[in-house]
Design a protein with these regions (language model features):
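Catalytic active-site module of serine/aspartate enzymes centered on a nucleophile-bearing elbow/loop
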Residues: 281-285, 289-315
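Short, surface-exposed "cap/lid" segments of acyl-processing enzymes
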Residues: 48, 53-84
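Conserved alpha/beta-hydrolase
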Residues: 76-103
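N-terminal cap/lid segment of alpha/beta-hydrolase-fold proteins
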Residues: 25-48
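Accessory cap/linker subdomain of secreted extracellular hydrolases
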Residues: 163-238
Length: 315
């Protein structure tokens, strides 16, 4: 069987007492048109006339709940969706084209661009507005999903605002370089790392046979076109060009997106944005040292859901 190559760029890739309340909201499958087949998601309906949040997952094989096929199961987006329902806010969380429930939307889940992901977001917005009658839709993105949210919002009047969770402020080539440089065992191959990323940033492909075996999966030929496209986008510039309400959440102990290197760039790009820094939260927005729930999920910081809900309700 032909092996699947998943994009994996981020290398280090609490809601308490909500379950009983979340049951009051109706959860059902929902689809949107994709290029070759449907895009799939889950609609949590908190009631007629409620605000709706569209949730875009992060990089690689990350599903609509925020769980990774590579083993990490924080369920960040599912927890947020269930939590928002208790505040009377509906949501749609989605699988990306070519993956999970949206596998049939395209022939190859690695043959994608940020612009195509953004196009899918706009397709979802049309479906959700038609289904709910909402005038506009909030778009929430986690990690790379925040970049997709920013790209989708350019010139779109039917987006209420953006909610950016653990979102890079630097181009992702710079983020990946920093992540790899932070790995102690990578010290001897740093020149190869820098050469490969420099080439991709310049729009050039990399011969993986010239790389250390441990780097060949990161720069696999099947993901290089996506990486070339991805590295071309500057989140801070996209945010600067967007003029709607923006809510930014960043974990202080996030090892993938930096509270010191990324967050200041986003704040500078939009001084009017509402920013919440959670000092002890990791990339998934769980507290550092959080004890996994029985389903393996990591309870997110208790401030995340009420802060998002308050921001939406104020706008």
């Amino acid at each position: 069987m032909k092996s699947k190559i998943f994009r994996f760029l981020f290398l280090l890739s609490g809601v308490c007492g909500l379950a009983s309340h979340a049951l009051a909201a109706e959860s059902s499958p929902i689809t949107a048109p994709g290029p070759l087949g449907v895009l799939a998601g889950t609609f949590v309906n908190a009631g007629a006339g409620t605000s709706v949040v569209l949730m875009v997952p992060g990089s690689g094989p990350t599903d609509r709940d925020g769980n990774s096929a590579l083993g990490q199961k924080p369920a960040t987006l599912r927890q947020i969706a269930d939590g928002l329902a208790t505040h009377g806010i509906s949501s749609v969380r989605i699988d990306k084209r070519g993956m999970f429930g949206s596998k049939q939307a395209v022939a190859d889940g690695n043959d994608v661009t940020i612009a195509e992901y953004a196009s899918d977001v706009r397709s979802w917005i049309g479906v959700i507005r038609a289904k709910t009658g909402a005038r506009c839709i909030w778009v929430l993105g986690h990690s790379e999903g925040g970049l997709v949210a920013l790209a989708s919002a350019q010139g779109q009047a039917d987006i209420c605002g953006l909610i950016l969770l653990s979102t890079p402020g630097r181009p992702l080539g710079e983020v990946l370089r920093a992540q790899l440089h932070a790995i102690p065992s990578a010290k001897t191959v740093l020149p190869q790392i820098d050469t490969a990323i420099d080439a991709l940033e310049a729009g050039q492909h990399v011969d993986v046979q010239t790389l250390h075996p441990g780097l060949r999966g990161v720069f696999h030929p099947r993901v290089q076109d996506f990486m070339i496209d991805l590295f071309h986008h500057d989140p801070a510039l996209l945010l600067k060009a967007y003029h709607g309400p923006v809510f930014i959440v960043q974990g202080g102990t996030d090892r993938q997106i930096s509270a010191t290197d990324d967050l200041p760039l986003l704040k500078a790009a939009d001084p009017e944005a509402t920013v919440v820094l959670l000092p002890s939260a990791i990339h998934s927005l769980a507290d550092l040292g959080a004890v996994p729930a029985t389903d393996g999920s990591l309870p997110i910081d208790g401030a995340v859901v009420p802060d998002i809900a308050e921001f939406i309700q104020k706008h």
